[in-house]
Amino acid sequence: MTISPPEREAKVKVTVDTDPVPASFEKWGQPGHFSRTLAKGPKTTTWIWNLHADAHDFDSQTSDLEDVSRKIFSAHFGHLAVIFVWLSGMYFHGARFSNYEAWLTDPTAIKPSAQVVWPIVGQGILNADVGGGFHGIQITSGLFYLWRASGFTNSYQLYCTAIGGLVMAGLMLFAGWFHYHKKAPKLEWFQNVESMMNHHLAGLLGLGSLGWAGHQIHVSLPINKLLDAGVAAKDIPLPHEFILDSSKMAELYPSFAQGLTPFFTLNWGVYSDFLTFKGGLNPVTGGLWLSDTAHHHLAIAVLFIIAGHMYRTNWGIGHSMKEILDGHKGDPLLFGGEGHTGLYEVLTTSWHAQLAINLALLGSLSIIVAHHMYAMPPYPYQAIDYGTQLSLFTHHVWIGGFLIVGAGAHGAIFMVRDYDPAKNVNNALDRVIRSRDAIISHLNWVCIFLGFHSFGLYIHNDTMRALGRPQDMFSDTAIKLQPIFAQWVQNLHFLAPGGTAPYAGAPASYAFGGETVAIAGKVAIMPIALGTADFMVHHIHAFTIHVTVLILLKGVLYARNSRLIPDKSNLGFRFPCDGPGRGGTCQVSGWDHVFLGLFWMYNSLSIVIFHFSWKMQSDVWGTVAPDGTVSHVTGGNFAQSAITINGWLRDFLWAQAANVINSYGSALSAYGIMFLAGHFVFAFSLMFLFSGRGYWQELIESIVWAHNKLKVAPAIQPRALSIIQGRAVGVAHYLLGGIVTTWAFFLARSLSIG
């Protein structure tokens, strides 16, 4: 950190342009107003596709970085408005159409429902009896558990929050309009990274966490403590009563009687009755101790508020991002040269570069969250709702996958549109690009090695089982392939808190070791033992993830040029082939790598969620008898069945699809129809992926001829989708069909097993 004399630094000022762009409904009402070509109106059917492709491609609408920045900034507010409306709808359903209040009275027996179907053509069958005399569709979003942890005790509070969501949405829409049409920030404001970091760290993350910690302490803790003790929700004081009357809090947490005295006298240990360090799970609810999570958010708030004072703005003290980057010369062995010189300019002038990094980080974080949701279930009673646990895991894994592919997409767009080779000479980025052949060929070798070896283990096992030679298989009972490193890591995590957190009463997660936590006779979490089957699936994960990385990284590193197409950057981010007369140059654009990466992302994550689903049903989820014996849902069949391809097909896909296939005539029948519809959408995608554009153009021309014959020819000339558009429609339906099919399969299964 350096302290600089005040005159050296340019002062940070918030400067805006007033009324830069007039708001005109007349202009917005004209389709394609953002592009001179599109604004002329449609001559062919390609127009409608280009309209959708370019509406949000601000780079194609203007080359002015300031205007692009303002558009993105304004669009963020629009995005937030949509999120608030969506959240408001969730809370409104909880208030108006749910059994939340009944569920609070008996959360282990009554199932959560927040949707009731109107029986117009007999859909009433979908309204199952979820307990407590309520009929509706069982939900697996986990919102009931979040609401209980937040301290909601009645529908009226949910109503108020729903209205609050709509108010916030309105505020966001206003802000989006105001900051583009009335007071639009200048480019310097968007590029002032030190102020941005300080505000985001201290304000968004720091004060955001502090506010949540405050809510948890003053509202969630007392309400949940009383609910856990069996007090009826209607008898619990309302949130404002706890906030305004400290004597009510002192009855539950005696330290409240002392007020802020211990804080200012540094006698903080007094507050340990509500800021705890227990570890493990609450034995009543199977969720993390709320007093632990309040403590966690308070600590996070302190860290981020400190972090938000780290960067130098107007006070001549703190870090300068540019100085840090320019001063970082990198590892002399691997990436010497100019190190990170020039990267500050890259990240402040290319929002694609910035977005690529943020998407990669956020996507990875989402997948980490997926694993924490079951290993350390944060909300009360969440852990024994297996449908919700499976849904939350799948959701966060898939979101992470899409964001990581998005990182590859925007990395490639950055390379094509924003990268300036002259400004990146011998720095880390330039050296990575110059090492691309070594990187990609090594990655390719890794993929081949992993693919042949992991698949080879399965082929061996299927062959041995087919020939009736179980003693020659790789399994826990024959030739063992124990994941010794994973077991060591598990054991380390189980034992480490004893040394690193000596005051914690229990391990962070029982998934690593310890006891079985059961709530109302159902397993919430227990140690997850790993064996040969996990070792084999793990290497399939390694294989598919490395292939996804290979495709995305090749797309980024070869986005501007390659030996095959040296002038690729002139062709842009998306193009089908390198023009007529050059065969064998298709699917080389940055866009095509994203297209192919999406298939491998889906492939790779399907195996992840299948592994999770079966492993949990086989080795974790189940019922606990009074004598402590655990009966797992599928009776521990994972270890012996998941070691052959046939086992995966027979004992996972086929056996567990029984619930969705046999769902007709029951409350789960909608999933049966969705299962078929998902297969149909998936099959429909293949029509776009397997056929070429010329086939359809020929067909269309003969249809147009027939229309001309009948004198009903359209004014807008029909055209086949472009090659890229066809692939886009194909991959969209492939993923949609696959996701819907998996959704129906998982939900019908998990709701059937309770």
UniProtKB/Swiss-Prot annotation:
Family annotation (SUPFAM superfamilies): Photosystem I subunits PsaA/PsaB
Residues holding phylloquinone: 696
Residues involved in chlorophyll a' binding: 679
Keyword DNA damage: no
UniProt: [4Fe-4S] cluster binding residues: 577, 586
Organism domain of life: Bacteria
Keywords, comma-separated and alphabetical: 4Fe-4S, Chlorophyll, Chromophore, Electron transport, Iron, Iron-sulfur, Magnesium, Membrane, Metal-binding, Oxidoreductase, Photosynthesis, Photosystem I, Thylakoid, Transmembrane, Transmembrane helix, Transport
Family the entry assigns: Belongs to the PsaA/PsaB family.
Described function: PsaA and PsaB bind P700, the primary electron donor of photosystem I (PSI), as well as the electron acceptors A0, A1 and FX. PSI is a plastocyanin/cytochrome c6-ferredoxin oxidoreductase, converting photonic excitation into a charge separation, which transfers an electron from the donor P700 chlorophyll pair to the spectroscopically characterized acceptors A0, A1, FX, FA and FB in turn. Oxidized P700 is reduced on the lumenal side of the thylakoid membrane by plastocyanin or cytochrome c6.
PANTHER family: OUTER MEMBRANE PROTEIN, OMPA-RELATED, PHOTOSYSTEM I P700 CHLOROPHYLL A APOPROTEIN A1-RELATED
Protein name: Photosystem I P700 chlorophyll a apoprotein A1
Organism expressing this protein natively: Rippkaea orientalis (strain PCC 8801 / RF-1)
Chain's gene name: psaA
